[in-house]
Amino acid sequence: TRELELGDDHDGIIELPAEAPVGSDFADYASLNDPVIDLSITPNRQDCMGVRGIARDLAAKGVGTLKPLRSVYRMPAAPLPTDGPDPDVATLDPEGCPAFYGQEVRGVKNGTAPDWMARNLKAIGQKPISCLVDITNFVMIDLGRPLHVYDKAKLSGGLVARKAKAGEQVLALNGKTYTLDEGMTVIADSAHVHDIGGIMGGEDSGVSEATTDVVVECAYF
């Protein structure tokens, strides 16, 4: 699967189920034949940084029909996680982070994203990671609104956007430790720096399969 960019497994030949049509193109069978459109967005069209913004623009020109948002997001029949109390979030760096919002969600279950979501992410070069992370990436690509998700249990108090202190360090999600300076905007709680604002999240508050409560961040850097 690694050679075909279908996953990280590299143990041997992929065995297809018995009902797979013999002689058919594998790309057609595995739904890997969707066209990929590569766009270069000019600075004045930030509304087209997501798929929906592009679709809205095309629909306005008579190319296709813009689907209602509710028909795009497939809501499950099972009970949804519940919203928790509003988390304590604030920005002390109005220049680097003019807007900083958060929403606590309780009772989530992390795991593998649905196949349809994983396929959509892979089609545009995004590697599926986990359900919670994949949802934030899907929303970002669809609506053009970057999000970040924290494991609530790994936070100490509220979250604040502020300037970094000289010499502060953060272990990022890519496994590297970065030393910060006063010109950088970070997201921190009372104990740790958790994000380099608008660039990369931190490992200390990353979600895992054991995560049950999260804080979803929506910020403007």
Q: What function would you assign to each model-found segment?
A:
Residues 1-21, 110-111, 133, 178-221:
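Conserved catalytic alpha/beta cores of large enzymes that bind or transform nucleotide phosphates
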Residues 1-81, 215:
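Phosphate-backbone binding interfaces of nucleic-acid-interacting proteins
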Residues 28-32, 50, 59, 94-98, ...:
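Solvent-exposed alpha-helices and their adjacent loops that cap or buttress functional pockets
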Residues 62, 66-168:
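Glycine/proline-enriched, intrinsically flexible loops and inter-domain linkers
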Residues 22-26, 87-91, 171-174, 197-203:
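Glycine-rich, charged/polar anion/phosphate-binding loops
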Residues 43-63, 125-149, 191-209:
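Conserved phosphate/anionic-ligand binding catalytic regions in large, soluble enzymes, centered on
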Residues 36-40, 50, 57, 102-104, ...:
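Structured core elements
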Residues 164-182:
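A structural-propensity feature for long, helix-poor, extended segments
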